[in-house]
């Protein structure tokens, strides 16, 4: 090394001297020699370094590390596939086939181009399988009915309401012309919820970027929750899994479902058979009409889309009416149609033509009425529509007061009208209505004291809805009321009667200012005008007016179901010098109406009813005695309230010595007493048997046998016969048998697990697909179910549960099939007809329990779907009342029906069948050429071009789902909503947010439990 340095020094010196002293050519020669020398030196040094590498240490010093890396590399080439759904092997195999096809088509195609080994595909498949196993395990814990009804359906209801509001903002009160349907959809989406769409939905720019960004974030959060060892997984693998899920599953699925053509195709598929049936029915009706010469005229309504020929035929039918009552009914219906049309905004020429046709039809009906009645024709339609009565005239007519009372009930302000009518019943003469300045006998003072006391308790001291009466007036009345009956001051009596009259005038002013103007513009008032019930000879005499009010006053308690008011108004009217015989009819009417509200009171109308009627003895298999006792208690309370009202009427009838009225009231009193006595005896009988109906330590259960049954259009199934025996001192005293299917056992087990944690540890036979009813399998299941029931009988809290008692009760009859579309339409139409014209007789919204957690969302959805777009003040009934009606109509049968349908829809057999069809579809689709798919899509697209035909088919389909009560509103709303792709995507992404929130909530609860 030292010699080399000397050599370099000498060479460098010579080179410098050469540069300074020699010529150009010599310099070139020396420069070449120096380069050769420099190359030789560098080459020699590199060779020495290579020789030194042989003495360095190896980079894998530890053999254990080398072996670990080698094992990991070998394991990455292998994948251990565990069953995804071990409970049902058939379903697990189908899922395996789908995953295999998915990996082969979407993953291995590009992964083998990167690395010709299964390392990447195995890693992705492993993580996907872990996610599926976690999701499938959690699906079994989900109550699908609760999720759909309590979570998804409220979102759909809100979406429906916001869509209607946005559409009203875009369309407004006039016709708006859009050159393209997509333009209207964008405008509606922009106004939807004041422009607050989901973050993944963009109306401008590139929406795909926002969707991918949201789905990437959503998938990452979901994987962090459901994927085991998420934070220990390679970021590269997580990124690959996320992109695979987004681009191959989520994004195509969202785009496919949000496309309006997806729903259009479903409508076309579902309505095909319905259209064929409707065509056959239409031809049959046409043939029957040709054969019948006496069909009912006016059975069909005049419609907006009717042709000129149909309209002329309709007019011809009106001219053939031979019954004056039919003609008047038809005229009233036409007037209602016209009134409804006037309350809507006419957008085009069709509405104007429809209005003119209604006008012609009304005039034709009036001419027919004139001809049939033999009176000269005078067109009074303008008077009928424009006639507006004063509030005093309305209160002086019984029919008008009935309509006004219905209107006040809807506004929850009927107490004002009740109070006015009560005080009106106290008046005795026209000149001095309350007879305030006459010193009446002492009995009159006592009677007024009783009436005033009841009025104060019912209207002045009421906590729920007190009347807004000035304090000086109430103080004056209270002074008289607070006196002792033995020492009543006549001066205070006179002051109290004057104060009561002033309070009545004050209430009249309140109704005049707050309610009258709305009432005369409401549909109720119009219906009153159109029913030909306006008296042409209204007397201005107050006594005649008050007598008509008396007839109406008796009907009020049956509507409000307030016993206090019944006693007040009835007692007040008995003071009059000429009692009306309508009291007898009204009392009977009120009793019968209460019977309609309480089905257990029907025996009051039975003339053969006697107190000696046998009391029902509950059979041993009746385990629902507690519910029956509660129902009887409610009916007894209602009957006692009626009895108190009758007692008050009897006392007043005795004062006026009306023997006819007294006889009728006494008879009604006896009938109600008999009904109360019978129900009390029935209740006592059930109470004496209630203790004996307990299951714990008093009964034993066994499953003796099973039998194979078959229903129409369903495969064979097994029914297990359960024997329950009553024990007394170790001996069997009585027993009964019930038959249940396995799915009923499974539903019972599912409900009990949610309520009683101890049931979760019991052994229950799992679901499995039984291709054929093997007796060995059924016998094994029979023994397992018997052991399960016997375990339940050893748990006292489960034995007392309502679910188990209903399951084992012989009285647990399957709910009636209310969801046949024709039956539902018929029942609903009848209900609405009663509410529309006799609402006073049938329903009291204040007595409805609106806390139903299951039927409430469904009722709200139906109300939102079928409610008109008018202002809330002009609606036929408030939405709260609609919801209460639907909850009463459906009750628990709706929940049971939905759970049963979902259970039947997601049975293992059907899930297996759907998975198999899906797998075969994937395999068959992969075998086709893509060009054929494109040609097929191009050939199918024109089926959606004819929007009018599609809308008609949608109307037919939805009309079959909701028949009998003008489904046109629902048809149009649903169809318009489904055609907006942006809002469809908004709903889907909102549901994804709800899924993410539910997963986070479940993860937090799991972490707290652990």
Curated annotation (Swiss-Prot):
<feature type="compositionally biased region" description="Basic and acidic residues">
    <location>
        <begin position="923"/>
        <end position="932"/>
    </location>
</feature>
<keyword id="KW-0175">Coiled coil</keyword>
<feature type="transmembrane region" description="Helical">
    <location>
        <begin position="6"/>
        <end position="26"/>
    </location>
</feature>
<dbReference type="GO" id="GO:0015031">
    <property type="term" value="P:protein transport"/>
</dbReference>
<feature type="coiled-coil region">
    <location>
        <begin position="622"/>
        <end position="692"/>
    </location>
</feature>
<dbReference type="InterPro" id="IPR044926">
    <property type="entry name" value="RGS_subdomain_2"/>
</dbReference>
<dbReference type="GO" id="GO:0005773">
    <property type="term" value="C:vacuole"/>
</dbReference>
<dbReference type="InterPro" id="IPR036305">
    <property type="entry name" value="RGS_sf"/>
</dbReference>
<dbReference type="GO" id="GO:0043231">
    <property type="term" value="C:intracellular membrane-bounded organelle"/>
</dbReference>
<dbReference type="Pfam" id="PF00787">
    <property type="entry name" value="PX"/>
</dbReference>
<keyword id="KW-0813">Transport</keyword>
<dbReference type="InterPro" id="IPR003114">
    <property type="entry name" value="Phox_assoc"/>
</dbReference>
<dbReference type="Pfam" id="PF00615">
    <property type="entry name" value="RGS"/>
</dbReference>
<dbReference type="GO" id="GO:0035091">
    <property type="term" value="F:phosphatidylinositol binding"/>
</dbReference>
<keyword id="KW-0472">Membrane</keyword>
<dbReference type="GO" id="GO:0071561">
    <property type="term" value="C:nucleus-vacuole junction"/>
</dbReference>
<keyword id="KW-0812">Transmembrane</keyword>
<keyword id="KW-0653">Protein transport</keyword>
<dbReference type="GO" id="GO:0098853">
    <property type="term" value="C:endoplasmic reticulum-vacuole membrane contact site"/>
</dbReference>
<dbReference type="InterPro" id="IPR001683">
    <property type="entry name" value="PX_dom"/>
</dbReference>
<dbReference type="GO" id="GO:0016020">
    <property type="term" value="C:membrane"/>
</dbReference>
<dbReference type="GO" id="GO:1990854">
    <property type="term" value="P:vacuole-ER tethering"/>
</dbReference>
<feature type="domain" description="RGS">
    <location>
        <begin position="390"/>
        <end position="529"/>
    </location>
</feature>
<feature type="domain" description="PX">
    <location>
        <begin position="698"/>
        <end position="815"/>
    </location>
</feature>
<dbReference type="Pfam" id="PF02194">
    <property type="entry name" value="PXA"/>
</dbReference>
<feature type="region of interest" description="Disordered">
    <location>
        <begin position="923"/>
        <end position="944"/>
    </location>
</feature>
<comment type="similarity">
    <text>Belongs to the sorting nexin family.</text>
</comment>
<feature type="domain" description="PXA">
    <location>
        <begin position="88"/>
        <end position="274"/>
    </location>
</feature>
<keyword id="KW-1133">Transmembrane helix</keyword>
<protein>
    <recommendedName>
        <fullName>Sorting nexin-12</fullName>
    </recommendedName>
</protein>
<dbReference type="InterPro" id="IPR016137">
    <property type="entry name" value="RGS"/>
</dbReference>
<dbReference type="InterPro" id="IPR036871">
    <property type="entry name" value="PX_dom_sf"/>
</dbReference>
């Amino acid at each position: 090394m030292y010699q080399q340095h000397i050599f370099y020094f000498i060479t460098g010196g010579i080179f410098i001297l050469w540069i300074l002293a020699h010529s150009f050519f010599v310099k070139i020669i020396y420069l070449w020699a120096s380069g050769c020398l420099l190359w030789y030196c560098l080459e020699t040094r590199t060779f020495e370094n290579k020789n030194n590498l042989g003495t360095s240490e190896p980079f894998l010093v530890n053999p254990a590390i080398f072996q670990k890396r080698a094992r990991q590399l070998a394991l990455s080439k292998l994948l251990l596939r565990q069953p995804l759904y071990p409970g049902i092997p058939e379903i697990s195999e189908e899922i395996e086939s789908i995953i295999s096809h998915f990996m082969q088509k979407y993953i291995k195609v590009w992964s083998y181009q990167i690395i010709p080994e299964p390392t990447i595909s195995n890693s992705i498949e492993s993580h996907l399988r872990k996610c599926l196993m976690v999701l499938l395990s959690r699906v079994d814990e989900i109550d699908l009915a609760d999720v759909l009804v309590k979570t998804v359906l409220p979102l759909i209801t809100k979406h429906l309401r916001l869509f209607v509001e946005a559409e009203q903002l875009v369309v407004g009160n006039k016709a708006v012309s859009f050159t393209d349907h997509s333009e209207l959809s964008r405008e509606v989406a922009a106004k939807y919820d004041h422009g607050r769409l989901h973050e993944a939905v963009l109306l401008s720019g590139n929406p795909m970027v926002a969707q991918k960004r949201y789905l990437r974030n959503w998938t990452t959060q979901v994987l962090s929750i459901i994927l085991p060892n998420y934070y220990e997984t390679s970021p590269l693998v997580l990124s690959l899994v996320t992109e695979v899920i987004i681009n191959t599953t989520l994004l195509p699925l969202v785009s496919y479902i949000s496309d309006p053509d997806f729903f259009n195709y479903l409508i076309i598929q579902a309505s095909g058979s319905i259209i064929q049936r409707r065509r056959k029915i239409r031809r049959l009706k046409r043939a029957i009409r040709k054969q019948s010469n006496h069909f009912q005229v006016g059975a069909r309504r005049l419609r907006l889309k009717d042709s000129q020929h149909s309209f002329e035929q309709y007019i011809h039918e009106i001219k053939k009416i031979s019954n004056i009552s039919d003609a008047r009914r038809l005229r009233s219906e036409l007037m209602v149609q016209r009134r409804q049309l006037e309350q809507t905004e006419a957008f085009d020429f069709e509405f104007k033509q429809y209005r003119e046709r209604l006008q012609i039809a009304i005039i034709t009906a009036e001419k027919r009425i004139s001809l049939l009645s033999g009176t000269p024709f005078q067109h009074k339609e303008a008077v009928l529509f424009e006639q507006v009565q004063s509030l005093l005239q309305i209160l002086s007519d019984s029919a008008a007061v009935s309509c006004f009372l219905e209107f006040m009930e809807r506004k929850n302000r009927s107490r004002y009208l009740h109070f006015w009518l009560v005080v009106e019943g106290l008046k005795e003469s026209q000149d001095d209505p309350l007879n305030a300045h006459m010193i009446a006998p002492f009995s009159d003072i006592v009677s007024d004291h009783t009436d005033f006391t009841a009025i104060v308790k019912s209207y002045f001291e009421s906590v729920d809805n007190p009347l807004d009466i000035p304090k000086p007036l109430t103080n004056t009345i209270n002074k008289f009321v607070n006196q002792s009956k033995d020492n009543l001051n006549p001066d205070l009596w006179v002051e109290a009667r004057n104060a009561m009259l002033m309070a009545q005038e004050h209430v009249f002013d309140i109704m005049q200012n707050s309610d009258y103007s709305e009432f005369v513009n409401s549909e109720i008032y119009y219906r009153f005008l159109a029913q030909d019930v306006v008296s042409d000879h209204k007397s201005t005499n107050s006594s005649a007016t008050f007598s008509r009010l008396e007839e109406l006053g008796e009907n009020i308690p049956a509507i409000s179901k307030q016993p206090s008011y019944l006693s007040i108004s009835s007692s007040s009217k008995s003071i009059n010098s000429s009692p009306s015989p309508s009291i007898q009819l009204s009392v009977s009417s009120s009793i019968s109406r209460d019977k309609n509200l309480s089905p257990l009171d029907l025996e009051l109308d039975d003339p053969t009813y006697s107190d000696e009627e046998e009391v029902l003895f509950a059979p041993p298999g009746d385990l629902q005695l507690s519910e029956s006792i509660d129902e009887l208690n409610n009916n007894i309370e209602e009957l006692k309230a009626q009895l108190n009202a009758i007692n008050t009427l009897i006392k007043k009838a005795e004062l006026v010595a009306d023997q006819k009225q007294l006889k009728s009231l006494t008879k009604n009193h006896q009938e109600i007493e008999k009904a109360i006595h019978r129900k009390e005896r029935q209740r006592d009988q059930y109470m004496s048997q209630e203790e004996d109906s307990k299951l714990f330590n008093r009964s034993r259960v066994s499953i003796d046998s099973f039998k194979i049954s078959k229903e129409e259009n369903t495969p064979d199934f097994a029914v297990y016969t359960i024997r329950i025996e009553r024990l007394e001192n170790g001996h069997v005293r009585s027993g009964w048998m019930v038959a249940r299917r396995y799915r009923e056992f499974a539903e019972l087990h599912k409900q009990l697990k949610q309520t009683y944690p101890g049931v979760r540890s019991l052994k229950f036979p799992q679901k499995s697909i039984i291709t054929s009813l093997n007796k060995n399998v059924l016998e094994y299941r029979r023994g397992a179910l018997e052991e399960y029931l016997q375990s339940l009988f050893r748990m006292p809290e489960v034995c007392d549960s309502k679910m188990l008692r209903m399951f084992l009760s012989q009285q647990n009859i399957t709910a009636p099939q209310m969801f046949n579309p024709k039956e539902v339409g018929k029942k609903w139409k009848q209900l609405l007809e009663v509410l529309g014209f006799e609402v006073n007789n049938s329903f009291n919204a204040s007595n409805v329990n609106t806390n139903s957690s299951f039927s409430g969302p469904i009722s709200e959805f139906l109300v939102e779907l079928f409610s008109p777009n008018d202002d809330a003040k002009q609606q036929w009934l408030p939405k709260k009342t609609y919801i209460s009606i639907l909850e009463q109509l459906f009750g628990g049968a709706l929940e049971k029906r939905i759970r049963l349908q979902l259970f039947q829809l997601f049975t293992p057999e059907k899930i297996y069948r759907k998975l198999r069809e899906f797998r075969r579809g994937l395999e068959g689709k992969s075998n086709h050429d893509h060009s054929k798919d494109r040609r097929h899509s191009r050939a199918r697209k024109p089926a959606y071009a004819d929007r009018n035909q599609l809308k008609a088919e949608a109307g037919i389909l939805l009309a079959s789902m909701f028949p009998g009560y003008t489904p046109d509103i629902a048809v149009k709303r649903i169809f318009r909503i489904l055609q907006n792709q942006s809002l469809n995507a908004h709903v889907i992404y909102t549901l994804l947010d709800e899924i993410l929130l539910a997963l986070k909530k479940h993860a937090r609860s799991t972490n707290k439990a652990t």
